[in-house]
Structures are given as structure tokens and as C-alpha cells.
UniProtKB/Swiss-Prot annotation:
Name the UniProt record assigns to this protein: NAD(P)H-quinone oxidoreductase subunit 3
Listed PANTHER family: NADH-UBIQUINONE OXIDOREDUCTASE CHAIN 3
A Pfam family this chain is assigned to: Oxidored_q4
UniProt catalytic activity: a plastoquinone + NADH + (n+1) H(+)(in) = a plastoquinol + NAD(+) + n H(+)(out); a plastoquinone + NADPH + (n+1) H(+)(in) = a plastoquinol + NADP(+) + n H(+)(out)
Function of the protein: NDH-1 shuttles electrons from an unknown electron donor, via FMN and iron-sulfur (Fe-S) centers, to quinones in the respiratory and/or the photosynthetic chain. The immediate electron acceptor for the enzyme in this species is believed to be plastoquinone. Couples the redox reaction to proton translocation, and thus conserves the redox energy in a proton gradient. Cyanobacterial NDH-1 also plays a role in inorganic carbon-concentration.
Amino acid sequence: MFVLSGYDALLIFLLLSALVPVLALTISYLIRPKGSGAFRTTTYESGVDPRGDSWIQFNIRYYMFALVFVVFDVETVFLYPWAVAFNQLGLLAFIEALIFIAILVVALVYAWRKGALEWT
């Protein structure tokens, strides 16, 4: 019977995680169509010939929604470890998390009142 130590399993995982993408790229390179010419360099746009210029201005609403999403996504990243270790942490950590959430609620109310969440 082959018994792995803790680091052997990590080494096998690292090797496999490096090998799988290399193997997938190699296989796709070998079985790809071998065409050449101008058709290969055209942009694929849902099976339709592309129309218009690709450099267009996006509405600022997209950026505002993205910014608000990033703020609350980062909040989730910071609150998840706190929620996992909630039982081991004391009252001080709970109060700190409440202050953190309160600051983000104030930011959400500010964005809402400024109209950053309005689509019209």
C-alpha cells in the first residue's frame, strides 16, 4: 500500500493542475482546423458579419453598476472568513463587523440617493 504524506498530495495536485491545461491546449492545437487566409483573421460576432465600429462609448450606468457590484463583492470576500470563524471570535470582532457593514450600508444609501442605481 502506498501512503502519501501531506506534501505528496499537494505535489500531485500541483502537477495535475499544471498538466491538465497544458494537455487541453495541446489536444486542441492538434485537432484544430488547419485553414489559412483572410477568413481566419475576421472577427466572429454570433455567426453574423460584424457591422459598425467596435470602439463605442458605453453608458455611464454600466460603470456605476459595476463599481457598486465590486464594492459589495469585496464586502463578501471580507465577511466570509468572519462568518466561518464567528463562534471562535469574541464580541469585539462582532462589533467590528457591524461597523464594517454599517459603513457599506451608508455607501449603498449614498449611491441610491445619488441615482447610481437608477437605470432610467
